[in-house]
Amino acid sequence: NEKPAFLIHTGDICYEPGLTIHNQVVNAQTMDCPVYYCIGNHDLVKGNYGEELYESLYGPTWYSFDIGNVHYVVTPIDHGDNPTNYTQKDVYNWLKNDLALIKKDQALILFNHDLFTPNDSFVFKADDDHLLDFRSFNTKAQIYGHMHYNYVRNQNGIYTICTGTLDKGGIDHSPSSFREIKVDANDNITTQLRYAFIEPQIAIVSPMNNQTAAACTITEDQLPVSVNTYYSQAKTSHVSYILSDSENNQEIAKGDLASRTD
């Protein structure tokens, strides 16, 4: 209900059952926005070739699209449970032609199930004679999922971003979550996790057990009121309060609380 520009699954949709069910329940019609997928190593299943089922359900394993001033590129993982019908040379040839057509200074964000490089080089390598240096473009980030943990790293100006599994958390024991990524008008990237499966909840932090928050300046006739709120499906827009006498339920004060965090 926050109208994202698109949703993307970064791979390991997972084997035949996962590939089939995701196609039915997580798509543009059910999510009310564009939905994209990357192919993961566990999506290369038995068939005439590893990506055959994926292609029949989701389409090409590599593709690109533009939103605003950002060019988004999805490429397939180069290894998996079953052999692929494509090679890194095939991907290189397409990628070279695709990037040759982007606008000058257009921001570039890359998706692949696996991390391209653990160091700062950011070179796509088919072989020693076929290399693409992503640093020669306005590359902002590579977003991946193969490690199944929650991790964000700035690799000398290019972010690498990984997110754990939505329905069961990460290998690093992080809780179930999904990731929100924002790209502003200047192509700057910010990201935060949104914890999954949490129904609307509110907890009074202050006053509590005859104690009040100390991290604020108040006068004798003031009472600091602090609450925590959370809901997986939406951010809190505002919190209103009514303070009443516990003996006669008479209203003492009411108003709206000021947001101190996001």
Question: Model-found features: residue ranges?
Answer:
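Active-site glycine-centered loops adjacent to acidic/histidine catalytic or metal-binding residues
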Residues: 11-12, 40-41, 113, 145-146
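Residue-level marker for buried hydrophobic side chains located in beta-strands
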Residues: 7-9, 37, 110, 143
